């Protein structure tokens, strides 16, 4: 199972966030993923190697100014996935978050409109790594996997 939906929302001071926008970002980035875990848990438990992988962001840790709602939801997502991983530790389920780093996406273009998109990797460059992480014969690392070296074509856990 892969949870990849995300909503950036407006980059604005926390005190300027509209309640409706806050609710939408929270609903998309956190609540939808919790619902996915809740709905898929029986199937993951029935699997010989259930995998629950969610996409996070470095802002879960760096928490830059004006990124309040997005940063809060990604930090909360990492927390809930860590808790779920602990709760399922004695089962075949493995849950983790992946921070792919800067990727050429619509969301990134909205956050960094002056950035040349060709200076960041295409989103599909992460696919081989994600597939490797969810292989049934692999024991994925615990917690959030973050990529420091984006010069690689296919990132690896050992990087």
Predicted regions and their residues:
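Hydrophobic structural elements of the Rossmann-like NAD(P)H-binding subdomain
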Residues: 2, 53, 95-98, 108
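A short, exposed helix-loop element centered on a Lys and neighboring polar residues
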Residues: 37-38, 82
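C-terminal helical subdomain
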Residues: 90-93, 97-98, 105, 113-159
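Catalytic loop of short-chain dehydrogenase/reductase
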Residues: 7, 19, 45, 49-76, ...
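Catalytic tyrosine of NAD(P)H-dependent dehydrogenase/reductases that use a Tyr as the general acid/base
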Residues: 25, 34, 70
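Conserved NAD(P)H cofactor-binding loop of Rossmann-fold oxidoreductase domains
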Residues: 4-11
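Substrate-binding pocket helix/loop in short-chain dehydrogenase/reductase
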Residues: 12-14, 21-23
